[in-house]
Amino acid sequence: MASLFWSYLPAIWLLLSQLLRESLAAELRGCGPRFGKHLLSYCPMPEKTFTTTPGGWLLESGRPTEMVSTSNNKDGQTLGTTSEFIPNLSPELKKPLSEGQPSLKKIILSRKKRSGRHRFDPFCCEVICDDGTSVKLCT
């Protein structure tokens, strides 16, 4: 009886994956015949699994995409921002590091203001169709 189950398991898996693939293709065809070209030009590596949202298909990767500076250049010296955790570091080196922190925060904040709410995510792409619907794909 168990061998019968294992022989049917690949067929069931193929049937279910085909049904999902056809339903996705039907939704993506609503964007027109040129959708594939746009998908290739915007997404180098699209993911194959999607979930539906009101704005279109979406897979949220949940990965944060924020660049964090790890060094501060003050008076020609490059100091790591994590150097305060080094036990044998002299107080002379720790002092310029603490003085440099406000300027480092100011640079990071100004970067965030310039980028606005639209961040470039190398793992996602969004294709907007002519009818106003959008498709967002994330790896």
Curated annotation (Swiss-Prot):
Lineage top rank: taxon: Eukaryota
Disulfide bonds listed in the record: C31-C125, C43-C138, C124-C129
Signal peptide positions (record): 1-25
GO cellular component: extracellular region
An example Gene Ontology molecular-function term: hormone activity
Propeptide feature: residues: 59-114
Keywords: Cleavage on pair of basic residues, Disulfide bond, Hormone, Secreted, Signal
Subcellular location: Secreted
PANTHER family, A to Z: EARLY PLACENTA INSULIN-LIKE PEPTIDE (PTHR12004:SF3), RELAXIN (PTHR12004)
Role noted for this protein: May play an important role in trophoblast development and in the regulation of bone formation.
Family classification: Belongs to the insulin family.
Protein name as annotated: Early placenta insulin-like peptide
Organism of this sequence: Pan troglodytes (Chimpanzee)
Gene: INSL4
